[in-house]
């Protein structure tokens, strides 16, 4: 999982990527390709 300052590029990397909020942090999850997981500080 990458830690990024901006998730704008992370959510456009794959069409299955979704931006969600968990425990006060913003995550990008991708079920079909978990390589594209990311988190914002």
Swiss-Prot record:
Record has Ribonucleoprotein as a keyword: yes
Keywords carried by this UniProt record: Ribonucleoprotein, Ribosomal protein
GO cellular component: ribonucleoprotein complex; ribosome
GO molecular function, one term: structural constituent of ribosome
InterPro entries linked: Ribosomal_bL36 (IPR000473), Ribosomal_bL36_sp (IPR035977), Ribosomal_L36_bact (IPR047621)
Gene Ontology BP terms: translation
NCBIfam families named in the record: PRK00831.1, rpmJ_bact
Family: Belongs to the bacterial ribosomal protein bL36 family.
Listed HAMAP family: Ribosomal_bL36 (MF_00251)
The name this protein goes by in its record: Large ribosomal subunit protein bL36
Species in which this protein is naturally found: Xylella fastidiosa (strain Temecula1 / ATCC 700964)
